[in-house]
């Protein structure tokens, strides 16, 4: 399992973490610049969840960068247990937030036609932020599965 792509302290792990953090930051940036997002609970939850995702992923990206630079091994069972719990929690929260935001976007666009009735509503930005959140979740879920797989191999 030492050669598994995406393990902590490897270039693959660093790329996964940086991708998670960048997509979460993009989601926060797009949603935060959207007019009226704070009026909808699902969008506020998305911002909070992506904030947590960004902090967790950025912290672990820094740890991966240090481990690569110092040639350290981050695959001890204690560290992997911490990574598994953190990754699963952030992945589940990110998926819930992304799904709820997607539900509101679909409601606005297809069901009640808010986007047509209220052209000042930035539905395109809501949709783009939700897409960024799903991309961040996909990378987070990938990391969570890799960490679980590594922990199970011990």
From Swiss-Prot:
Membrane topology field: Multi-pass membrane protein
Principal cellular location given in the protein's record: membrane
Cystine crosslinks: none
TM region(s), chain numbering: 18-38, 43-63, 88-107, 131-151
Cellular localization per UniProt: Cell membrane
Pfam family, one: CASP_dom
Topological region Extracellular: 39-42, 108-130
GO annotation, cellular component aspect: membrane; plasma membrane
Family per record: Belongs to the Casparian strip membrane proteins (CASP) family.
Subunit (UniProt): Homodimer and heterodimers.
Annotated protein name in UniProt: CASP-like protein 5B2
